[in-house]
Amino acid sequence: MRIMPESEKLQYSGRIDWTDRNAPVFVFPCTSVRMRFTGDTLKVYVRNKKAYWENYLGCILDGEQTKLRLPDDGDGLLEIQVKPSAEQTAGDGFHEVLLFKRQDSCHEVTFLGFEIGEGETVLDLPPVPQRRIEVYGDSVSAGEVSEAVDYVGKPDPEHNGQYSNSWYSYAWMTAHKLGAQIHDVAQGGIALLDGTGWFNEPDYIGMETAWNKIHYNPVFGPATDWDFTQYKPQVVIVAIGQNDNHPEDYMKEDYNCSHSVHWRREYGELLKKIRGQYPDAWIVCITTLLEHDPSWDQSIDEVCSLLQDEKIRHFVFHRNGSGTPGHLRIPEAEEMAEELSAYIEKLDIEW
């Protein structure tokens, strides 16, 4: 029995392109669809567009996580193995599945529906959390290479996308600890400014361009704007400033040079634009444990102070900028999430 994407029994989270109500496009990490159902049959219809790396969907079925390899390009029907439970056999149980985007815009995947057994039922889910956070970040916020747990505190191993998992990003872990929904506007390699960072080489695209978009990777076509009325977070985390040292670490070389002054001005402008969309939200500015020069954090602190907005804060982790030369692995992301969620819980937030 086909369950179409527009079914009211399904729950979604994330910035999703709903141009076609029965073909929603997942772009950002942590974007998800959830379903509760009966029976022991589960398949998912998808359409994938690949830019780079191998692409996988995350799947958590009855608390057990797996990953599903997506076709490089085109439609696919993915079968998910369901273990019948004693409760299910007795006729009063159910299964719950969460499908989610593990990776950033290295691909875009269209969700085309579920398939369950004939005569089976899709059940109501509990209400979504009333707490809502939003994250603007880079590969660390996306959970890139997070599953390479043999490389804690070390440079990355060779990889082709298989270790990237947004579930284990500090961003989603923080949302879990807070009991909050999340929109994770994160892209590997992205910096603040166009023309810097690593994303979309050699015509680098920065967060100053991508922050208000659904589609922003030119590989997939023209950019499209996000409708900010669709989601109003009470907390926004801005985690930009670690890819900005490429191709030149001008902040480290000369804190007061014209490039550095320009960066601080534009960082402040981004915060003002976010504030314009969310007048009542708390905005928490961070970098991460990934090694970087402290001058970037000094700049963020300076901007936050100059804005004189009580609800814009700069938070610094215990091992900020000195934790690891590689991407954050699961234990390091957990460390960040523990510190960040504890800090957020102490703010006077009207959830």
PLM region descriptions:
Residues 267-271, 300-301:
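Generic structural signal for well-ordered alpha-helices
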Residues 1-166, 348-351:
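N-terminal secretory targeting modules
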Residues 30, 156-256, 290-297, 331:
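Conserved SGNH/GDSL esterase-like catalytic core that processes O-acyl groups on lipids
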Residues 170-181, 270-282, 306-309:
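A structural motif corresponding to the C-terminal end of an alpha-helix
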Residues 132-136, 141, 182-186, 234-239, ...:
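Structural recognition of the beta-strand scaffold that forms the well-ordered cores
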Residues 124-126, 223-232, 272-277, 349-351:
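Surface-exposed acidic, glycine-flexible loop patches that form ligand/cofactor-binding
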Residues 282-351:
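Extracellular serine-dependent O-acyl
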